[in-house]
């Protein structure tokens, strides 16, 4: 089992200026800092005794057989990226703050999941690569 945690963040100004529709025309800037509240991701291989291949627990629970049936977009895309089409995997998300808090929870969850899932593959990525992959997934794949 792999457990990772990623901090939430507070943006002081510039919200929305990190979207391509804005910064390609107007430039963008965000000043942000992490806080001492975290998102946690646990990832483990499931024994092959279940009728599903993927169990995902966040504010919903998913039990699905095929990766393309996963409703949680970032987790689906991360599993595809690391080629987890044949393994039985469980991803469990928990956090110190509720969803929709406005403190970057979805980005924290994506970054944390990339870190944990890459570690399961023994393909640890540096912080810059994790950040670029998270941006690609959130802005281009979804």
Predicted regions and their residues:
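ATP-binding N-lobe of GHMP and related small-molecule kinases
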Residues: 1-103, 115-125, 136
């Amino acid at each position: 089992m792999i457990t990772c945690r990623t901090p939430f963040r507070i943006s002081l100004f510039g919200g929305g200026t990190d979207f391509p529709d804005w910064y390609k025309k107007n430039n963008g800037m965000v000043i942000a800092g992490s806080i001492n509240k975290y998102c946690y991701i646990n990832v483990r291989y499931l024994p092959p005794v279940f009728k599903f291949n993927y169990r995902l627990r966040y504010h919903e629970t998913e039990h699905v057989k095929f990766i393309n049936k996963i409703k949680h977009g970032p987790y689906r895309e991360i599993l595809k990226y690391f080629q987890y089409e044949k393994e039985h995997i469980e991803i469990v998300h928990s956090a110190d703050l509720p969803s929709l808090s406005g403190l970057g929870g979805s980005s924290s969850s994506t970054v944390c999941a990339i870190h944990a899932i890459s570690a399961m593959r023994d393909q640890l990525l540096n912080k810059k690569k994790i950040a670029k992959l998270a941006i690609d997934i959130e802005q281009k794949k979804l």
